[in-house]
Curated annotation (Swiss-Prot):
It comes from Bacteroides fragilis (strain ATCC 25285 / DSM 2151 / CCUG 4856 / JCM 11019 / LMG 10263 / NCTC 9343 / Onslow / VPI 2553 / EN-2). Transmembrane segments: none annotated. Keywords: Ribonucleoprotein, Ribosomal protein. PANTHER family: LARGE RIBOSOMAL SUBUNIT PROTEIN UL30M (PTHR15892:SF2), MITOCHONDRIAL RIBOSOMAL PROTEIN L30 (PTHR15892). This is Large ribosomal subunit protein uL30. The gene is rpmD. The keyword Cytoplasm does not apply. Signal peptide: none annotated. HAMAP family: Ribosomal_uL30_B.
Length: 58
């Protein structure tokens, strides 16, 4: 499976608790941090849940 790089581009301040937990589960705790994950359905679902806070880096 391929990997994707995910970057947090917006602050988590003011976001609902479930979105904050999703960012934590992805390993994104600070702004402009990039993490790399396998492109599995569960990871893609988490990215979709916080798509307004993150960006996919090529």
């Amino acid at each position: 499976m391929s990997t994707i790089k995910i970057k947090q581009v917006k602050s988590r301040i003011g976001a609902p608790a479930d979105q904050k937990r999703t960012l934590d589960a992805l390993g994104l705790r600070k702004l402009n941090r990039v993490v790399e994950h396998e492109s599995t359905p569960s990871i893609l679902g988490m990215v979709d849940k916080v798509k307004h806070l993150v960006a996919i880096v090529k």
